[in-house]
């Protein structure tokens, strides 16, 4: 879920914190990518029609591999250096949110069965996407593929968004690419939405800068975290009737959740009986992340050509000619990106960003939309 309504809240109250950037403007940049979010997108979009999905000869789904392979090559060809960060064990506080998601998938599965029996193609398409879940096997497959491609992988101890933010705060990467707005709540200095969208969608990258958020909202980082908790996050329920705009007003007026609770009209607003906002706050401020330099050995290496062919072609039925051409693209891209950003050697490049247009910013583009098929390296349909 991320932070409920945060995109609109920022568009209305802190518009200068958001800038549309060209995909190509990140040439030479190291970017931490929320891997699970990307894999979820691939499973929903790549080669999928209704309940049909790309599979190998054994009937195992390969949409995530095709999506990860093609999208990563696109990043590399643009001179971008991705670092994929995978989720570890979720915090205990997230159990309730995960239970809600499980329940929604179960409901969607029942609805999908009804849609199939009725032959309603539109509902089949809709409900089949709601049943998608990223599994350990999907993650393991993508980790193996990325390592074969010479792209660094970080396995977070807990939340991937928190680890991405930590990499950004420590200067190891330029920004964080995800669709979950709680990357900002974890304090990522620069947060990028739509970087992992397919080029066919032609949507500019939306770059958020946390320093400008705080400046425009006139909040401290602690107050911004409280604002996000009040708006609605993955770690605890929100107070019914308090949305983002009301939460901002209350934080500006009272400064913290504790003071808000002391002054809140209890007849108008019902506070949850067990509301672990303080624990949620601690998770945002002091997340469980890897800081050991040895565990964060982030290096981009040459692709293992034989390994890629073995994994994609021999084990997963991808087309050998397409995979071979893709490997050449990786090698060419690696040489290109080794040049580094031009401004490191010459004068700074002019900023190509343009002001954000609020009407073009959907609150959630990930878990729904893109219905276009993506042509890729291989696979076959599975019903």
Curated annotation (Swiss-Prot):
Residues 338-346 are annotated as: Interaction with PCNA. GO terms for molecular function: 5'-3' exonuclease activity; 5'-flap endonuclease activity; DNA binding; magnesium ion binding. Keywords: DNA damage, DNA repair, DNA replication, Endonuclease, Exonuclease, Hydrolase, Magnesium, Metal-binding, Mitochondrion, Nuclease, Nucleus, Phosphoprotein. SUPFAM superfamilies: 5' to 3' exonuclease, C-terminal subdomain (SSF47807), PIN domain-like (SSF88723). Residues 370-383 have a biased composition (Basic residues). It comes from Arabidopsis thaliana. It is found in: Nucleus, Nucleolus; Nucleus, Nucleoplasm; Mitochondrion. This is Flap endonuclease 1. The gene is FEN1. Its cofactor is Mg(2+). SMART domains: 53EXOc (SM00475), HhH2 (SM00279), XPGI (SM00484), XPGN (SM00485). Mg(2+) 2 binds at residues 180, 182, 234. GO terms for cellular component: mitochondrion; nucleolus; nucleoplasm. Belongs to the XPG/RAD2 endonuclease family. FEN1 subfamily. Interacts with PCNA. Three molecules of FEN1 bind to one PCNA trimer with each molecule binding to one PCNA monomer. PCNA stimulates the nuclease activity without altering cleavage specificity. InterPro entries: 5-3_exonuclease (IPR002421), 5-3_exonuclease_C_sf (IPR036279), Flap_endonuc (IPR023426), HhH2 (IPR008918), PIN-like_dom_sf (IPR029060), XPG-I_dom (IPR006086), XPG/Rad2 (IPR006084), XPG_CS (IPR019974). Binds 2 magnesium ions per subunit. They probably participate in the reaction catalyzed by the enzyme. May bind an additional third magnesium ion after substrate binding. Pfam families: XPG_I (PF00867), XPG_N (PF00752).
């Amino acid at each position: 879920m991320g932070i409920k309504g945060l995109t609109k809240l920022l568009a209305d109250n802190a518009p200068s914190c958001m800038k549309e950037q060209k995909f190509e403007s990140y040439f030479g940049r190291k970017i931490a990518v929320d891997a699970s979010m990307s894999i979820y997108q691939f499973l929903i979009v790549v080669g999928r029609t209704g309940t049909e999905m790309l599979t190998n000869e054994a009937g195992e789904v390969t949409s995530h591999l095709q999506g990860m392979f093609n999208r990563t090559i696109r990043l590399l060809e643009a001179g971008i250096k991705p670092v994929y960060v995978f989720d570890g064990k979720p915090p205990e506080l997230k159990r309730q949110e995960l239970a809600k998601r499980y329940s929604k998938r179960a409901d969607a599965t029942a609805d999908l069965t009804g849609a199939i029996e009725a032959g309603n193609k539109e509902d089949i398409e809709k409900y089949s996407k709601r049943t998608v879940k990223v599994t350990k096997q999907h993650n393991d497959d993508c980790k193996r593929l990325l390592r074969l491609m010479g792209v660094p992988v970080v396995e977070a101890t807990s939340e991937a968004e928190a680890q991405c933010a930590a990499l950004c705060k420590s200067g190891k990467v330029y920004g964080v690419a995800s669709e979950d707005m709680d990357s900002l709540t974890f304090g990522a200095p620069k947060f990028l939405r739509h970087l992992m969208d397919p080029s066919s969608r032609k949507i500019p990258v939306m770059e958020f800068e946390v320093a400008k958020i705080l400046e425009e909202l006139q909040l401290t980082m602690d107050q911004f975290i409280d604002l996000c908790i009040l708006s609605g996050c993955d770690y605890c329920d929100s107070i019914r009737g308090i949305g983002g705009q009301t939460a901002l007003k209350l934080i500006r007026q009272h400064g913290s959740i504790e003071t808000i609770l002391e002054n809140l009209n209890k007849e108008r607003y019902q506070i949850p009986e067990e509301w672990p906002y303080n624990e949620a706050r601690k998770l945002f401020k002091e997340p469980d992340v890897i800081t050991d330099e040895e565990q964060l050995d982030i290096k981009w290496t040459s692709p293992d050509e034989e390994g890629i062919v073995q994994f994609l072609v021999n084990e997963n039925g991808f087309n050998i000619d397409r995979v071979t051409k893709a490997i050449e693209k990786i090698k060419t891209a690696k040489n290109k990106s080794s040049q580094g950003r031009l401004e490191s050697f010459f004068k700074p490049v002019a900023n190509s960003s343009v002001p954000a247009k609020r009407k073009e910013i959907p609150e959630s583009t990930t878990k729904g939309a893109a219905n276009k098929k993506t042509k890729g390296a291989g696979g076959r349909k599975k019903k």
